[in-house]
Every structure is written in C-alpha cells, then in structure tokens.
Amino acid sequence: MGINEIIMYIMMFFMLIAAVDRILSQFGGSARFLGKFGKSIEGSGGQFEEGFMAMGALGLAMVGMTALAPVLAHVLGPVIIPVYEMLGANPSMFAGTLLACDMGGFFLAKELAGGDVAAWLYSGLILGSMMGPTIVFSIPVALGIIEPSDRRYLALGVLAGIVTIPIGCIAGGLIAMYSGVQINGQPVEFTFALILMNMIPVLIVAVLVALGLKFIPEKMINGFQIFAKFLVALITIGLAAAVVKFLLGWELIPGLDPIFMAPGDKPGEVMRAIEVIGSISCVLLGAYPMVLLLTRWFEKPLMNVGKLLNVNNIAAAGMVATLANNIPMFGMMKQMDTRGKVINCAFAVSAAFALGDHLGFAAANMNAMIFPMIVGKLIGGVTAIGVAMMLVPKDDAAQVKTEAEAQS
C-alpha cells in the first residue's frame, strides 16, 4: 500500500467518525452515547455536511471551465505554445500559472501539454494548486472579506508566498519523480530537466508579480480583482452553453467538452465534470472532519507552533484553518497581530486547501499525485513563512512584541 492510499484510508476513517456523529446528533449527541470520546468528535457531523454541500460551489467554479478547456486550448494555443517553447517549457505551464487546478487549470493543462503527461500533472496539479488559486481565487476573495487597512499585509504576505512557489513546485516534482507515479499501470516520467526547465516561465511571472506587489500593490491587487471577475463571466458562459448542449442538443460554442458521460466513454476510465465534482465531494466528507478533529485533538502543539512564530492564538488557528480552506482565515484576520496577518497570507498562497478542496480534487482525478501535491504545497507554505517573517514592517516590531507578551 502506497502513501497515497494511506492518505485516502485516513480520510475515510474520519469520514466514518463524522457520519457516526451526524447520526448520533439526531438522538441527543455523540457525548450522550460515547462519553468522553463522543464529546471529542462532536461537530464533525456538521463538517460532514459541509463537505457534501461543497458540491454546489465546486460545480459553479469547475463545470464551465472544464467544458471550455478544449476551446480555450484551440484559441490560446497559437499564442501560448510558441512563447513557452521558446523558453524551453511545456505550454501546459500556462494553465497552472493563471488557473486553479479545480477551476479549469487541470483540464486546460491537459489540452496544452501535447501528450506530455508529466508536464500536464506538474502544471495542472502542483503549480495549479499554488499560483493559479492565488490569482483567481484567494486574492479576489480576500479583498471582499478583510478590512481595507489589512490590504498592505495581504500584499506583503502574497509577495512572500509568490516568490516561494517555485520551491514548492520543485519539491512536489521531485517527490513525484522518486515516488514512481503511474497512470493505468504506466509510469509517468518526471525528470530533473522537466522539473527545472518548466519553472522558467513560472519564475518570470513570480518575479513580475512580486515586483508589482512591492512597488504598486494597490494596482496589482485591483488587477487581480478585475481578472477574477472576467474569469467568473467566462466560466458562466461555459456553464450555460454546456447545459444548453446537454439538455437541448444545441452547440452554442463548437468544441465544448460534455459535462456528463458521452457515448464511447468507459465507466471508471473517463470522468466528466459532474462526476468529478461528485468524487471530490465524497473525499471532502472525510477531509473537512479530519481538519476539525485534528485541530481539536492537537490544539496544544498547534498553539506552541504559534508561540514559536511569535504570533497570537488567532493567527495560529488561522494557519490550521487554511489547510482546509482559506476563507475562514481571512475572516479571522482582523483579530490577528500584524506578524500573524503577513504570515497567514504568505502561508495560504501555497498551503491553502492542502487538506481540503485540492486534496479532494487530486484524489478524484489523479490519486497517484496526492502525496507529491501535498508535500509541494506544504514546503511552499513553510518557506513562505520564513520569507514573511523578514517582511513584517519594522515599525510594527514593537507592536508584535507587545501583543505576544500580552498572551503569555
């Protein structure tokens, strides 16, 4: 049994615990029947529900872009392919740079990869779980949640996170290379050359974004917001056209991928958008309760990590929450100390969703890549913390020290 299978077994263990809690909550709660252990698992049933309810949000984000992937590849290919080939990189890296793996990046990467499976997975699941989500999701969502006064800390954190994405990608690529990733029994050939050469365009984009966040942070952040709105519009067009094609047979946009199984598809080998979403939700039934219960059971060690980083308890809790979903973390930012705000935003760039949506997506689409993706995301997140600690404004150092002393 490999590490990817072990991770799946662990999540299913937590899924069963959460299912028991949901059942017992109908009859007075888990504590009533299971005593001390029951009390320790109470609330996991609610996370069980959250995991399944995520299906709707996932569908809105994924279905339209998944259907549009071959169309976008056809339109963008003549421009993207020559540029990336000139840099010595596979064109699929474009997809993971701008799109999250679960917002079309994985499927667009496949269309642009030209048959190079390793490059497709490197972009679609490793890069597409770090840089893409930051640009199309995390920054726009954060701006709608955080206080305006915290935007400077968001910019500093994202800057720290962006520059360490290549480190996370290389780490994930090396794990994939040495773990012997296979698809349908066939080995996927990750090489040093592929891992390093495909980082060239990513490094260029990372440096440009970092410079923009350093010198024109407000304009850069507003630019991300505009891009995200454009993307939502594009996804909506794709979703509407795909539904019309499925229900009425009208092909409003030629070349759309089916969103349900089509004639010729082999069950178990080909999964269309709607089935992928269902598979992800099944994984989230265990992933969300797992994060809740691990946070509860290991609260003291996690708080000690916060003390080690010299941040308050809210900031430490935010980092743990980020591993499942960064939205709660952004909601907690106003209660964090300055250092905690920058560190949390930096950590979230790569590490967000590592034990949530991205884990579910990898498990549903390519479970051989679960471990490489998680390792890459965590290494990217941890190294981002190191950079963020150097970027905390010096004029806030006294405030950080005072806030830390107030907790002790």
UniProtKB/Swiss-Prot annotation:
It comes from Salmonella typhimurium (strain LT2 / SGSC1412 / ATCC 700720). The chain crosses the membrane at residues 1-21, 61-81, 89-109, 126-146, 155-175, 192-212, 230-250, 274-294, 313-333, 342-362, 369-389. GO terms for biological process: ethanolamine catabolic process. This is Probable ethanolamine permease EutH. GO terms for cellular component: plasma membrane. Belongs to the EutH family. It is a multi-pass membrane protein. It is found in: Cell inner membrane. Its main location: membrane. Induction: Part of the 17-gene eut operon transcribed from a single promoter, induced by ethanolamine and adenosylcobalamin (AdoCbl, vitamin B12). Probably involved in the diffusion of protonated ethanolamine (EA) into the cell at low pH. At low pH most EA is protonated, and this permease becomes necessary. Contributes to bacterial survival and replication in acidified macrophage vacuoles, but not to bacterial uptake by macrophages. Expression of the eut operon allows this bacteria to use ethanolamine (EA) as a carbon, nitrogen and energy source. It relies on cobalamin (vitamin B12) both as a cofactor for the ethanolamine ammonia-lyase (EAL) activity and to induce the operon. EA enhances bacterial survival in macrophages in a concentration-dependent manner, suggesting it is an important nutrient during infection.
